[in-house]
Amino acid sequence: MRRRLALSILALAAGAAHAAPDDIVGPAFRHPAEGALVLLLLEKSTEPHLVPGDKLMLAQLKSQLVIAGYRTAVLDYADYQLLEADEAAGGGERDPDGRLVVGLLARQRALAKLARIAAESSHCALVIRTRFVIRPAPVVDNFFAQWDGARRALKLTDTAPRANPDGPGRTVVGALRGLGSGLSIELMAYDGDGALAFTTHGAVAVPYVTRLGEGRVEWRDDLFFGDGDVADGMRIALAPMR
């Protein structure tokens, strides 16, 4: 009860969260007992602009689980990659150039196998893999994007030269519509029997600044100046643990 209350309070602090439509909670998933060991697996970002957020993401996953009453330890991602490569080779997935392709099924099988192996040696309740993903984010109310349980502000600027006092770089007041992109945390968890516990997502931020005057979009340079957005995204993604 105490651990669920702790996560519920964290969720209220982040605002109301609604699960993404493609989130999955396994039919056999049950909350681990208080004090259970949860093993964590960080998939490091390959996009340079996201790399600074990896440590923040892992730190938030650890701290929020500890607050909820669980013990945590971090697994070596290289061990998972070996299993992943084996599963991909067994599946025979290859690109047009003949190179091995690591698809979703290979990732799932590798994580399930890792969870079974880890449970035999550590008696862990879950293995949770965390990573950043870019997700579709519909624009709402002109200045916001809404996806994966949260609404986040768009960052819009107009850098075109102007004669008025506002000048270049002023914030544009205008209407945007359509589908944008949002940065989310993805959690994929398997229990000690190798069964899927859950796959969830939590919105972090709109990772791009739209420079309307120049007609281009680029990565924000202030994406990880603090960990507040990462913390909120993790609270949303950890909803099945409440």
Please provide the spans of the model-predicted regions:
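Positively charged n-region of N-terminal signal peptides that target proteins for export
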Residues: M1-R4
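Bacterial N-terminal signal peptides
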Residues: A6-G15
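N-terminal start-of-chain detector that recognizes signal peptides
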Residues: A11, G98-V102, L156-R162
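C-terminal/domain-edge helix-coil "capping" segments
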Residues: A19-A36, P136-P138, N142-R242
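Short beta-strand segments enriched in small/hydrophobic residues
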Residues: G35-T46
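Amphipathic, alpha-helical segments enriched in basic
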Residues: L40, E93, V102-R107, R162, ...
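N-terminal segment of the mature soluble domain
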Residues: E47-V139, Y190, L196
